[in-house]
């Protein structure tokens, strides 16, 4: 809730809505890389199951937790809401800004659902699959629009180009900073999650190996061998 307030209220909310493309991009990162996954992680599984059952949303939640659905819809939202047309039209009024923020949050919930859904069976089961999904959906694809913003030689958004300058920051420099925020800002979250998944994978593999060895040892005990020999003699 604190991060949601920081992204929405003054000063970041005002700067992102009317003055700085870089603040706009920082809002996007907070909604999608922090608020969304923490929202899923903050819901106990029993509560999620009860809500899904009462509202008959279990099947729908399972479908939106598919990696193809989450990855495609998130990146569509990312590209659509950062197009010059969308920014210049939606950021000019309070309702449009609210709608854009809300769509970002929905996109974040969609893209993180296959990884941290509160309902266990809705998560991806393969650790390599989870890591590949995060790398592609949150690492590779967003780098494309980030590159356009970073290397564009002129302002793409009229609303930020015509806004009063903040601390003397030019519109082009501000836009380049926005591209860098989009490209680099999510790296700690994405790669931190990938490292955590690698550790979980290692621990799960170690536990499976220990269980397998324990079963083999149980089958190799003298009592088991004597029983096997007796059965063979009979």
What are these regions (language model features)?
Residues 1-234:
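Alpha-helical membrane segments of multi-pass proteins
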